[in-house]
């Protein structure tokens, strides 16, 4: 089913570019452009395929923005991520995104006027309101300042009992920063208690071990969260969140991402905040992917992924709706951006046959997020989506090659089959392995991604097609935190501070192949090109003029 409304789906023919060329569209996840040093894993890795797209080709290789306002985020200090990146790549326009939507709703007070808040506030008088999410200022999944505003807003509007279930980060922010975030939160909760609100932390754990799994990779992660948050059960019990985080971090090999689950107990050893009948629950992450599974456990009556033991009758709302197709959760505090008329929908209406493929951890990005936060096909007769199962139960630095080869082989076969006009893939290696902070493994990951690129480029060469190679945001190109002078930062013990997050770096885009018409080159007159410019570019290469409200195409055709 397509978008509703009276839309003229017919795209005009491009006056200079032909139809009928097979386009291989490759998105390298977490592949930015940075200075070539020992902490740039892309530089350290042998990447002959990607090098060949850049070297001596100034007209068909350039950099574009993948962070901040270019992808709908509030400021230039906001790192891009795969969700907003693929939204921009597929939509061809810039939409206010997660954090920005929430900021606007909080600033205007609209968040307290909409149906989601009215729904949960019915529990304020007699029940507890529980806030669950990532305690971080990373701005990728959540932001601490938004949680602080929610706590204040809930208390001012009648919440008498508040419990916070924290997930420590160490992925989008520095490992060890959890202690400072907990101290800040505890001070806010103490201020609420001074005003007569019963407010405290109830449970916690590291984001990668408790609650925040995605794409149904490992339900035990969600179960650990459920056990702590709902049942009040965890292997570790503490009197305060600060004691919990400090103690668990002191264990050998411990880090914020993988802290074990814990509950806060009173003097009698009883959990201070399990979720019970009549309570309200808010998951305060604004990014969708790592909240969907938990939302299913909280909302679905016929949930069967693990034994929930006890299913309380609650009022649940997400900060945002995390899956528009599943309408999950059914209640939310802030309405999502309405992304319509995506490039995929236009191309389907114009007969373009599309194949999309990645492995589990990024499959949703080349499909759901690319298509404007929409599940399913626009036209089942013209589209085929293939998901390759990701390795589960391991950290990706253990298998840094991931499924790059398998993705490339699927893409190659799709290109050579002649059945598709566009073959679109995401190669997750640079991002997923980069997040582990393992520099040597990330070098291997980048090499594997480059080999996959070569396989796809070779297939495009065979069919006389066109390649478009780009990325969704940076990560693997800079693996250390830096001081103001740009030098690698050290901690108090003199150890290198590893960077596991995304970056603010631009990403490359390259076009070429035997099917690229003579005279096609990147324009130099676009002031700040970004990911949203890619959709119109690809439409041009398919032989169409993009819709007039799309961000400008990156290419022009000059007479040679």
Curated annotation (Swiss-Prot):
**Database matches in InterPro entries:** Alkaline_phosphatase_core_sf, BPG-indep_PGM_N, Metalloenzyme, PGAM_B_sf, Pgm_bpd_ind
Q: Which reaction(s) are listed as its catalytic activity?
A: (2R)-2-phosphoglycerate = (2R)-3-phosphoglycerate
Cofactor note (record): Binds 2 manganese ions per subunit.
Q: Which residues cross the membrane?
A: none
Listed binding positions for substrate are 141, 171-172, 207, 214, 287-290, 362
Top EC class, one word: isomerase
Q: Where in the cell is it found?
A: Cytoplasm
User: PTM N-acetylglycine: at which residues?
Assistant: 2
Q: Which cofactor does it need?
A: Mn(2+)
Active-site residues, Swiss-Prot/TrEMBL: 82 (phosphoserine intermediate)
Binding sites annotated in the UniProt record for Mn(2+) 2? 29, 82, 472-473
User: Which annotated residues bind Mn(2+) 1?
Assistant: 431, 435, 502
Question: Which GO cellular component does the record give, naming just one?
Answer: cytosol
Instruction: Write down the EC number.
Output: 5.4.2.12
The GO terms this record gives for MF are: manganese ion binding; phosphoglycerate mutase activity
Alphabetized, the UniProt keywords read: Acetylation, Cytoplasm, Glycolysis, Isomerase, Manganese, Metal-binding
Example GO BP: pollen development
**Which pathway does the database say it acts in?**
Carbohydrate degradation; glycolysis; pyruvate from D-glyceraldehyde 3-phosphate: step 3/5
Note the superkingdom of the native organism: Eukaryota
Protein family according to the UniProt entry? Belongs to the BPG-independent phosphoglycerate mutase family.
Tell me, in a sentence or two, what this protein's role is.
Catalyzes the interconversion of 2-phosphoglycerate (2-PGA) and 3-phosphoglycerate (3-PGA). Required for guard cell function (e.g. blue light-, abscisic acid- (ABA), and low CO(2)-regulated stomatal movements) and fertility (e.g. pollen grains production).
PANTHER family, A to Z? 2,3-BISPHOSPHOGLYCERATE-INDEPENDENT PHOSPHOGLYCERATE MUTASE (PTHR31637), 2,3-BISPHOSPHOGLYCERATE-INDEPENDENT PHOSPHOGLYCERATE MUTASE 2-RELATED (PTHR31637:SF13)
The record's subunit annotation is: Monomer.
Q: What is this protein called?
A: Probable 2,3-bisphosphoglycerate-independent phosphoglycerate mutase 2
The protein's organism comes out as Arabidopsis thaliana (Mouse-ear cress)
């Amino acid at each position: 089913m397509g978008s509703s409304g009276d839309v003229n789906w017919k795209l005009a023919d491009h006056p200079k570019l032909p139809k009928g060329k097979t386009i291989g569209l490759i998105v390298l996840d977490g592949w930015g452009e940075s200075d070539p040093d020992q902490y740039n894993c892309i530089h350290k890795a042998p990447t002959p395929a990607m090098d060949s797209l850049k070297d001596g080709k100034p007209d068909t290789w350039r950099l574009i923005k993948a962070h901040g306002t270019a992808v709908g985020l509030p400021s230039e200090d906001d790192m891009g991520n795969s969700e907003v990146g693929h939204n921009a790549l597929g939509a061809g326009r810039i939409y206010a995104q997660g954090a920005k939507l929430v900021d606007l709703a909080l600033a205007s007070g609209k968040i307290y006027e909409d149906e989601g808040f009215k729904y949960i506030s019915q529990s304020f008088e007699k029940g507890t309101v529980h806030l669950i999410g990532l305690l971080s200022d990373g701005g990728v999944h959540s932001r601490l300042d938004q949680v602080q505003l929610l706590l204040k807003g809930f208390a001012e509007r009648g919440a008498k009992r508040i419990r916070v279930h924290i997930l420590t980060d160490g992925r989008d922010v520095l490992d060890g920063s959890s202690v400072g975030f907990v101290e800040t939160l505890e001070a806010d909760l103490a201020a609420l208690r001074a005003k007569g609100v019963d407010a405290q932390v109830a449970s916690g754990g590291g984001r990668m071990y408790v609650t925040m799994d995605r794409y149904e990779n490992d339900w035990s992660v969600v179960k650990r969260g459920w056990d702590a948050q709902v049942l009040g059960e965890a292997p570790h019990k503490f009197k305060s969140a600060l004691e919990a985080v400090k103690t668990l971090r002191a264990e050998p090999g411990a880090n914020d991402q993988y802290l074990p689950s814990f509950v806060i107990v009173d003097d009698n050893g009883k959990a201070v905040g399990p979720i019970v009948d009549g309570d309200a629950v808010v998951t305060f992450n604004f990014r969708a992917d790592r909240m969907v599974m938990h939302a299913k456990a909280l909302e679905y009556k016929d949930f069967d992924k693990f034994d929930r033991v006890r299913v309380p009758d609650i009022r649940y709302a997400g900060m945002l709706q995390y899956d528009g197709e599943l309408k999950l959760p059914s209640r939310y505090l802030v309405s999502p951006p309405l992304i319509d008329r995506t490039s995929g929908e236009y191309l389907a209406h114009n007969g373009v046959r599309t194949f999309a493929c990645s492995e589990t951890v990024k499959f949703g990005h080349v499909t759901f997020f690319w298509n404007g936060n929409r599940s399913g096909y626009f036209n089942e007769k013209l589209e085929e989506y293939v998901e390759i199962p990701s390795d589960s139960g391991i950290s990706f630095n253990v298998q840094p090659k991931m499924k790059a080869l398998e993705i490339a082989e699927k893409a190659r076969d799709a290109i050579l089959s002649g059945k598709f006009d566009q073959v679109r893939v995401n190669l997750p290696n640079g991002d997923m392995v980069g997040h582990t902070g393992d520099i040597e493994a990330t070098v291997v990951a980048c090499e594997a991604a480059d080999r996959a690129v070569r396989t796809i480029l070779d297939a495009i060469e065979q069919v006389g097609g066109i390649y478009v190679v780009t990325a969704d945001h940076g990560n693997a190109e800079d693996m250390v935190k830096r001081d103001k002078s740009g030098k690698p930062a050290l901690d108090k013990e003199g150890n290198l501070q590893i960077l596991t997050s995304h970056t603010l770096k631009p990403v490359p885009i390259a076009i070429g192949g035997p099917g690229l018409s003579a005279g096609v080159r990147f324009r130099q007159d676009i002031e700040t090109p970004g990911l949203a410019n890619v959709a119109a570019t690809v439409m041009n290469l398919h032989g169409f003029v993009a819709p007039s409200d799309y961000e400008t195409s990156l290419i022009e055709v000059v007479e040679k």
